[in-house]
Amino acid sequence: MSTVKEQLIENLIEEDEVSQSKITIVGTGAVGMACAICILLKDLADELALVDVAVDKLKGETMDLQHGSLFFNTSKIVSGKDYSVSANSKIVIVTAGARQQEGESRLALVQRNVNIMKSIIPTIVQHSPDCKMLIVSNPVDILTYVAWKLSGLPATRVIGSGCNLDSARFRYLIGKKLGVHPTSCHGWIIGEHGDSSVPLWSGVNVAGVALKTLDPKLGTDSDKDQWKNIHKQVIGSAYEIIKLKGYTSWAIGLSVTDLVGSILKNLRRVHPVSTMVKGLYGIKEEIFLSIPCVLGRNGVSDIVKVNLNAEEEALFKKSANTLWNVQKDLTF
């Protein structure tokens, strides 16, 4: 006797099940799941795979998303502890790692998370050799370097989420001070995603009007409006949120989804993401820091050569030295 499905549906062709825009997220903690829901709501993937070693948590999160399938257009959500579920991904987002504790700097996390990367990165590449890898785990700049070394992929395809979120926070706070929406406030933060990040006050503008032309002291200690406090707030944001709710999630999830959209849709938008900066601004070491990069289907296709003033360049080099002093002693 035929089944209800056989009576209802007659199959006409055997379809190839290879996904065209598969995304894998490694790590189903707060950040990984924020990335997942944002990606689903933006309809960026035809298949979403989740990977984690915490099997019960993974199963629960997967079921929870699958039960919402009516409300988004991703046809397939899969998960597993085994990385075979990630096979043939276009983008692999790595959020796995030890969580930053209250008062702990991102750099203090480093060796713990380097050890985790050693068990993750080679397996990802084995199953998705053509993927673009997006590193989100902190300290993101150093871990992007580690992931690049472990993966054997071109540096252009191993990208750190970097200062994309720092710059978003920067623009939000500028907009809040001016009473203008963040999309109309333009400003960049480069360097480390962390305490040594560099605000490019020389380029901050609204509608092409550089704020520095209105007040040359903008962003300095002698600025009467205390714009410098905005950068201090950017640096302190994660610490404050972790103190208040235990972790950050939503803004980084939205930021990562923004990067994924630029890559998958080949938008060639410019983002401040962590990439190899050796040879730029006099930096001689293999270091990953955020600079404005063009993102498209091949990952980082171009970098924007920002004209830094003397103070900004000195701060960028200081940021590089801060990372190098930690990175040079890593073992992996």
Swiss-Prot record:
UniProt-recorded Gene Ontology molecular function terms: L-lactate dehydrogenase activity
GO cellular component, one term: mitochondrion
Example of a GO biological process term: pyruvate metabolic process
InterPro entries from the UniProt entry: L-lactate/malate_DH, L-lactate_DH, L-lactate_DH_AS, Lactate/malate_DH_C, Lactate/malate_DH_N, Lactate_DH/Glyco_Ohase_4_C, NAD(P)-bd_dom_sf
Catalytic activities: (S)-lactate + NAD(+) = pyruvate + NADH + H(+)
Residues noted as binding NAD(+) in the record, renumbered to the chain: 29-57, 99, 138
Binding site for substrate: R106, N138, R169, T248
PROSITE patterns found in the cross-reference section: L_LDH
Annotated metabolic or biological route of this protein: Fermentation; pyruvate fermentation to lactate; (S)-lactate from pyruvate: step 1/1
Active-site residue list: H193
Keyword NAD included in the entry's annotation: yes
Enzyme Commission designation: 1.1.1.27
Cellular location(s): Cytoplasm
UniProt keyword list: Cytoplasm, NAD, Oxidoreductase, Phosphoprotein
Phosphoserine: residues bearing it: S301
Known function: Possible role in sperm motility.
Protein family membership: Belongs to the LDH/MDH superfamily. LDH family.
Quaternary structure, from the entry: Homotetramer. Interacts with RABL2/RABL2A; binds preferentially to GTP-bound RABL2.
NCBIfam families named among the record's database cross-references: L-LDH-NAD, PRK00066.1, PRK06223.1
Protein name: L-lactate dehydrogenase C chain
Protein's organism: Sus scrofa
